[in-house]
Each structure stands twice: as C-alpha cells, then as structure tokens.
C-alpha cells in the first residue's frame, strides 16, 4: 500500500483494510469481531460500520493493546477480549483481526484462541491498513470465509450475488433490490455475502449454479476462488442503474445465465418507469430540459460507471462528464468524457476541481467539501460515503428500477435548486 493510499484511508476516509474486514464479518448475524489493536483503530472501524449496520457497536469489540503489548505480545489482551465476548453470551462465532502494529508482532493468534477454549469457533486473519484499503480488507475477509465452505450439490437455476456490502451508501437497500429483481425473474438467490446473508446461507453458497459479481473490488477474488474450489462459473455484471440501464442489465444477466424469465417482470417495471418519466416531462415543460454545464461523478467503480451511463444516456444533457473512481477497475464508461483514478491521478484531479465552473456533483461529502473550500458553485446529492450533510432514511435503493426513481427525483430537485439559484443571482 502506497503512502498516499495509506494516508487517504487511515486519516481521511477512515476505511482501511481493518474496516473492510470488520464490515464483512459484522454483516453476518451472530458473528462477533475482536480487533486486536489499539482503541484508535477500533473506534474508527466500528463507527464507520455502525453508521450503516446497527449491530456493529454490539458485535465489534477490541483488545485495546498498549505499547507494552508490542514488546511482550498480545496474548493477555486477546484472552481478555475473548472473555468479554464469552460473558456477553450472544456470539455464535468470533473473528479476530490484527491491526497494522499487532500484525507485525507475530503472535500465534489462532493458537491463543484455541487455548482459550471458547464455546464458539474462532477465525483469525491480519487485516490492518498496511494490508490495503477497505476493498482489500473486505475481499480478504470474504476469502477467509470461503475457506470454511464445503462442496455442495448444485441447485439448478440458482446464483450467489458477490460484492454487495451493507455499509456502502444504500448498500442494504441495493442488496434488497438486486434480490427482488433476480427473484422476479425466477432466479433462486442462494446468498448475498456481506449484505445480510446468514452464516448458514453463506455456507450454502457452493450449491449455486453461478456467481454474479456486482462489485469487482469486493467480490471478484472470492468468485475466482470459488470457481477454483467448487467449479462455479462467474461473470462480472456490475450494478444496474437507470430504467433502461436496469432493463439491459436484466437481459444481460439472463443471457449469461441461460435460465430465468423476465418478460412479465419487465412489463411491470416498464409501467413504473412510464409513470415516473411522465412526471418528469411535466417539469420539463415548465423549466426546460435537464441541462448541467458540467457533471462530476465520484464513487466506487460500479456506482460511478453505472450512474454516469444512466445520467447521460437516459436523463440529462451536459457539455462535460467527469468520473473520479475511488478504486481501480478494468471496466469503462462510454458516456464519460474523462475518467480518473483517485490516488493515481491526484494532480489531474486537483486541476479538475480548480477548473470547475458550475454543474452537478454526485459524490460523497469529501468531494463537495473540496469544491466548497474553492468557492465553486455546484448542486449535488450523495451516492457514496461519507455523507455528512445529507440524510438517507427511506428504504429506496440507488440501483435497479426502484433506485432509478430515486435518482431521477434527486436529479430534478438538483436542477430546480440550480434554477432557483440562477434567478436569485439575476
């Protein structure tokens, strides 16, 4: 991990590998996470996960290592932490993850846990920030759980959805929408690891006939490992955004799977889209088309690329659409004029902000704050975390057909806000 990436994750985004691992483990009901490290790392990881997963404050705990632990080892700290979890009496399994510093000590964490002899299985791994950012930590935790899977008899017409996370912005709602779409097409969803699936459901994952990867940075390593171990084919399909984009996503998935039927389901969604777009046409007759001088989309790859494509192909007109990706991807977006990778092209990204004139920003609070500090005009709504100045309380997703309605609504409200600002300035 480069110095730039480490400083970005540890000091600004609060989303290092430790956080990613904790997010995956804590998403499994009945699981407790023991972070073997100082309270600093624990509070940052726990708070980030707890913002979206209400169990985190109860199921993530910490050994609270001291400087002397770096000299004498962390055995006593681990034993105390396991004792607290045992006394709570709610754990079904425990995951122990080392932070950066304790991972360098070389303690036999697995041996210490086995010697403790708790009433539940214990799984161990190193996952500090030096091991990577959130995505790497999440993916490594997923792989650790794949190690526990056993061969299962294949269930025809079934899939796992890999790469979902309930700590992404609207992550839980997106997971529910993906399950709704697939089940509406007659596809049996075995598991969605990282997004609400139980341990039993995840252990049944090898019975799926196919793995659909919706976020490469989170799910692709596990998909490759499951193909190797259980001969389950996989495909990277991204997340669906927009009305037309979601329809094309369904058709693409069914073509890949060669099972499922979508005609009836898509007919119902077409009616939903027609009614929503009718309302948009009414606004357009009053205020004109959805035009923005510039558009900036900054988010993880699946969100950024999918939403950018839906924006330009379905809803808005703009002179320039720029994407800032928060992690690497092999995918691209024909609708974008410029695509940059955060931490790899920071000088170009700095110039993008300095040269910004006005327009629509779809991002997290980090990007909008940066524009505010430069006194740049813009309208915005958030599609990624952190979101410090915008609340999300409804059960609507950002992805899929139901998510398209929310995005279209927010785009129109942003345009109306921009029109109101222009009238005030005149």
Annotated model-derived regions:
Residues 1-426:
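An N-terminal assembly and electron-transfer interface module characteristic of large anaerobic redox
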């Amino acid at each position: 991990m480069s110095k730039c990436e480490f400083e970005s994750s540890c000091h600004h985004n609060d989303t290092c590998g430790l956080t990613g691992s904790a997010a995956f483990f804590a998403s499994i009901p009945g699981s407790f996470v023991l972070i073997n490290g100082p309270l600093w790392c624990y509070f940052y990881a726990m708070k980030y996960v707890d913002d979206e997963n209400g169990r985190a404050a109860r199921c993530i705990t910490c050994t609270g290592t001291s400087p002397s632990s770096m000299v004498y080892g962390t055995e006593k700290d681990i034993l105390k932490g396991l004792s607290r979890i045992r006394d709570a009496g709610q754990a079904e399994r425990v995951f122990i993850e080392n932070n950066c510093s304790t991972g360098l000590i070389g303690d036999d964490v697995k041996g210490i846990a086995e010697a403790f002899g708790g009433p539940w299985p214990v799984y161990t791994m190193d996952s500090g920030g030096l091991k990577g950012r959130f995505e790497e930590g999440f993916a490594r935790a997923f792989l650790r759980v794949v190690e526990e899977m056993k061969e299962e008899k294949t269930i025809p017409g079934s899939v796992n959805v890999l790469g979902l996370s309930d700590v992404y912005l609207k992550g839980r709602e997106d997971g529910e929408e993906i399950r709704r779409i697939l089940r509406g097409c007659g596809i049996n969803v075995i598991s969605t690891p990282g997004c609400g699936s139980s341990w039993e459901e995840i252990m049944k994952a090898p019975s799926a006939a196919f793995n659909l990867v919706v976020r490469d940075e989170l799910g692709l390593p596990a998909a490759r490992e499951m193909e190797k171990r259980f001969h389950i084919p996989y495909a990277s399909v991204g997340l669906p955004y927009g009305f037309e984009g979601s329809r094309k996503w369904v058709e693409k998935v069914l073509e890949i799977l060669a099972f499922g039927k979508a005609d009836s389901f898509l007919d119902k969604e077409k009616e939903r889209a027609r009614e929503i777009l009718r309302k948009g046409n009414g606004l357009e007759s009053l205020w004109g088309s959805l035009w923005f001088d510039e558009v900036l989309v900054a988010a993880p790859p699946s969100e950024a690329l999918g939403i950018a494509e839906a924006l330009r192909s379905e809803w808005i007109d703009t002179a320039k659409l720029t994407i800032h990706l928060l992690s690497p991807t092999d995918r691209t977006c024909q609708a974008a004029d410029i695509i940059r990778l955060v931490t790899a092209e920071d000088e170009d990204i700095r110039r993008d902000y300095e040269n910004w004139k006005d327009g629509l920003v779809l991002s997290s609070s980090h990007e909008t704050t940066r524009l505010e500090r430069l006194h740049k005009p813009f309208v915005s709504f958030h599609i990624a975390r952190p979101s410090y100045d915008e609340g999300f309380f409804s059960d609507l997703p950002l992805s899929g057909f139901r998510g398209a309605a929310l995005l279209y609504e927010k785009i129109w409200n942003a345009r109306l806000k921009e029109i109101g600002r222009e009238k005030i300035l005149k």
